[in-house]
């Protein structure tokens, strides 16, 4: 699948004078290799909800798994718009990423199989999922798989220079 190349722009007021925009290829690579992500959703009463989770980057999207009775699943059923972040808490050398988009539940068997394989390749147990575990496959399935294709994204670089890059898709 061909990678979507967003329009990248440096937010100069939030960047060092000599900073350059972070190339999307660098951001995409970090989205692929990160191990822990944070999902932000909105509760039905309007309060925010943030939770850590694991995710994989595949087909220009982030994919994550959640139990069908978890708070994030309930929130996404009411409002699919979400934000996924990843990065680190070091001030010296880091690249923090923010991805905004709609979380779409995945039910296509071939895609679920590929997501399962990607999780298995990236994470050790207990983050291995088999396709029959997914709720799309009946009563026994307890897990929902969501795909978030970026609508907007941001990269915040820290180190010798500080940069704030905005990506528009």
Where are these regions (language model features)?
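Alpha-helix boundary recognition
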Residues: 31-32, 77-78, 120
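Short, surface-exposed beta-strand-loop junctions and turns on beta-sheet-rich folds
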Residues: 70-72, 91, 162-163
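Short, basic/aromatic recognition patches
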Residues: 10-38
């Amino acid at each position: 699948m061909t990678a979507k190349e967003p329009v990248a722009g440096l937010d100069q007021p939030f960047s060092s004078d000599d900073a350059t925009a972070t190339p999307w290829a660098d951001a995409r690579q970090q989205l692929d290799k990160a191990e822990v992500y944070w999902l932000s959703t909105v509760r039905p009463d309007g309060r925010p909800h943030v939770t850590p989770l694991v995710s994989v980057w595949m087909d220009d999207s982030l994919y994550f798994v959640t139990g069908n009775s978890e708070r994030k699943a309930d929130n996404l059923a009411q409002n699919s718009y979400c934000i996924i972040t990843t990065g680190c808490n070091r001030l010296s050398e880091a690249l923090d990423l923010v991805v905004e988009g709609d979380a779409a539940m995945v039910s296509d068997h071939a895609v679920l199989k590929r997501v399962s394989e990607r999780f298995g390749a990236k994470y050790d147990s207990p983050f291995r999922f088999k396709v029959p575990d997914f709720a799309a496959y009946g009563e026994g399935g307890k897990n929902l798989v969501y795909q978030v294709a970026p609508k907007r994204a941001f990269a915040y670089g820290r180190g010798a220079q500080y940069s704030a890059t905005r990506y528009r898709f």
